[in-house]
C-alpha cells in the first residue's frame, strides 16, 4: 500500500534522523499491525506555508493513487502572521488535492493538527499565550474543513504541549523522535481505519 505525506518541517522531521520522522514511524506501526504499507513518499520542506506546499507539489507531482495520504500544514502561516481566512482557502485546496491523490476517497486522508511551538524554548521572550491561541484558531479551521470533507482529524496539539524531558530536538523548537513517536501512536487508529475503507 502506498503512503503519501504532505507538509512542512514537522513532516520532513527537521533535526531528527529520517527513521524518527512521524510518517516513517507511523508506517512502521501500521506494518506491525499486519498492514502492508510502504515507506512514505514525502513532499515537505522546512518553512513551507500552505501556498509553498502547493508549489512544491506542482514542482514534483506525485504519480498514481495512494492508499493513505497525510496532511500537516499551517504553522508557518501562523508564524509569519498570515491571515486565517487565507489559510482556510489554501488549506481547503490542499485538502482537495490530498483527496485527489487518494483516488478521490476522503476517507483515505488523515490530517494532523498544528503543534504548539509556543511551549518550546525557542519561544522564550515571545507571547506564548497568543501563539497558543493563534494555533488553536488555525486548528479550529483545519478541523472543521477536514471533517466537512469526510477526512480523518488527528489532534496532536495536546501532546505537543506536554512537558517531557527530551520532547524537543536540540534546536529547542522542533519535536524529537520521541514526540514524533507519540504523534504516530495518535495517528494509528485513523490511519488503520483509512486503509480499511
Description of each model-found segment:
Residues 14-19, 81-85, 130:
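Short, solvent-exposed loop/turn segments at secondary-structure boundaries
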Residues 9-12, 45-50, 75-80, 115-119, ...:
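Solvent-exposed loop/turn segments at secondary-structure junctions
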Residues 115-197:
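Catalytic His-Asp segment of secreted/periplasmic serine-dependent ester chemistry enzymes
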Residues 1-46, 56-65, 181:
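Serine-esterase "nucleophile elbow" of acetyl-processing enzymes
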Residues 99-108:
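A short helix->loop->beta-strand "cap" motif at the edges of active sites that frequently abuts
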Residues 85-94, 138:
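Charged helix-capping and loop-helix junction motifs
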Residues 70-72, 108-112:
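Conserved, well-ordered alpha-helix/loop/beta-strand core segments that scaffold catalytic motifs
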